Amino acid sequence: MGLFGLFGRKKEVELDDNITEGILQFENLNLKLAIIQVLMYDLNLLKPRFDIYGFADEHKELEINTDSYTVIEPALNFFRELSIPRKFAQYVEKIDMDGGNEVYMNIIPQWDGEDECFDLNNLTSSEIRQFPNLKKATIMSSNFD
């Protein structure tokens, strides 16, 4: 059963104009980060491509520790505030959440993937419906119910 079957929804063949305009909406930041991984780092569609080292060089006044074992708030805020055009949703066919994903390494450069910091434990149907071509997702979660 695909993700659409899980949510009791049929896959739409084409996006209508109302869906392709605007920006994607997220209730869960960790889902947004997973989508950013796909669009920015895997498919190279979402620009600018965020790099914590370049960001730290441009914002020396923030004194960003690029060897951090904790969340770099300015980096997290960049992703939190990033608008993702709805037109890119059609390109998301799979999500592969992994502790080594670039999006996470740009938020916590020395993250070992062993805690629940980026776990995707909650997901709403309104969030997932934005991705009509999403067929497969490998997620990080601590919710095994």
Label the model's feature ranges:
Residues G8, D16-D17:
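A composition-biased, non-transmembrane "mature-region" signal
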